[in-house]
Amino acid sequence: MYALVDGLLEELNCDVVFKIPIFGGIPIYESVVVTWIIMAAVFLLCFFLGRNLSVENPGRRQVAVEAGVKFLNDFFSETLGEKGKDYIPYLATVIIYIGIANLIGLLGFKPPTKDMNVTAALAVMSIVLIEVAGIRAKGTKRWLKSFAEPMPVILPINILEIFIKPLSLCMRLFGNVLGSFVIMELLKMVVPAIVPAVFSCYFDIFDGLIQAYVFVFLTGLFIKEATE
């Protein structure tokens, strides 16, 4: 049990990789460095996939990319509704980032989503976007008025909901990623080594992708709710 606690504390700890020598030294944590690696990998992949595109004679690579883009566009269009289509690029970016961040543990890196600061930042960005979407769709006056709907007595609850939504998104993503680690450690204690290895692949691949889907799906629903 002590080994489990020690392992959990180690997973929660985010090491400082280096410091930028300004303002007394700005610490750059492991989750930030891994995020930079993910950003660089996605940029290079987009650069590679975006080369030599043709309208008249599309190659197999272009057809595959267009199919993927169409799939994401159709999926998010159903979730967001007509008024929320402007936010598809954001949701597509987030699901790609979270998906890769959860899978990067297979390469020996510590997933950034195990750092609560990362999940909190993603949640705050999403909630800011949701409220901005509501203001754009309804106008400032109608947006403010919506807090008193369907009746003025629930105004405090609607205001509190603004802070509950990011907390829910943050803790759901962080909790599920951390929960998979706890389950894996418990499996290692009670079953042979080969069984945890199989479940490790499940949690790293399927559960990681599911959590990315759940995060953007809920964000999409919140955007649709805000814009209607």
Language model: regions and residue ranges:
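Selective transmembrane helix interface/packing segments
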Residues: 1-228
